[in-house]
């Protein structure tokens, strides 16, 4: 495995912890800042807004070396998380979370392009999956560690840890990632030209709806209220889900190089659809629900690297914007899925019904990817 790809994965590890740890430390922040859980939840939205704003800003940096852009993005991540650790009140923390989100999509976009350029011939998807592996490891180890630090000591230490990790990322990107050839400058308008074609919209739509399908599904209350697991066992179950993410990401990276990435993504999306549908009908069978949970998380990250690679390949002239837009679609899916998944709970339906809605979202994502494969890949 190339050291340069490991350095890129260090970056997605830091971004993954920064994004997802908020779910675990939200109660501690709310208590410390004397705000409600609902108000504290807006800190998640602030990060997502930063992701959406930061990705298009890559257009400004299109003429700079890709390695230098990565270093600047890591620097912004450090500043945002260190400011969060030192935040004196809710609004300062809100701004810090917004700043922390700015480099997220941009880093994934630039990092994916660099990873594919550094890959051996015919192994571009696998290289991108190695970079994305940092995100899966963040969910497996980083988020539980950050949550434990918050519970035992202070939530500020969690953000401080991510900020300090940024120093290591800067060092290893500087040392291990070589300078790569710049992308051709197609001008400001040329960066958006790829959006006139159908292919990127199919991929982005599938990303948003497929991810939204998984985020519809309220896994923790389903496991405790329907499957009968204790609250204490959730940590172990979430680790199992994390292993599913790691496995799904790495396996799909290899398969995408052997077969068509659109085909692999469509199959993974179909797996999510079926798994969520089975959750709705069979969640009361505890061991089966755990297996289905792992299949869902594996599928979620099995579609990540193929979709990232596809956006690079089908956004000629605007590769950085195209690759970064995957994370924008991902975060929009988070918001839409969480909202729609909560609707059946608000009207008094059980915890199984969000999975049914999620299955519908995933099915539409599957149809979009299948259409993409048939139109753009099978005919080539």
Q: What is the role of each PLM region?
A:
Residues 54-66, 248-260, 345-346:
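Helix-to-loop junctions at the C-terminal end of transmembrane segments
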Residues 96-134:
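Cytoplasmic helix-loop-helix junction between adjacent transmembrane helices
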Residues 90-92, 121-175:
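Helix-loop-helix hairpin linking two adjacent transmembrane segments in secondary transporters
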Residues 80-83, 91-100, 287-295:
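Paired small-residue
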Residues 53-91:
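Conserved MFS/SLC helix-loop-helix module at the cytosolic interface between two early adjacent transmembrane helices
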Residues 176-207:
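Juxtamembrane intracellular "pre-TM" segments in multi-pass secondary transporters
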Residues 262-307:
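C-terminal transmembrane helical hairpin of 12-TM major facilitator-type secondary transporters
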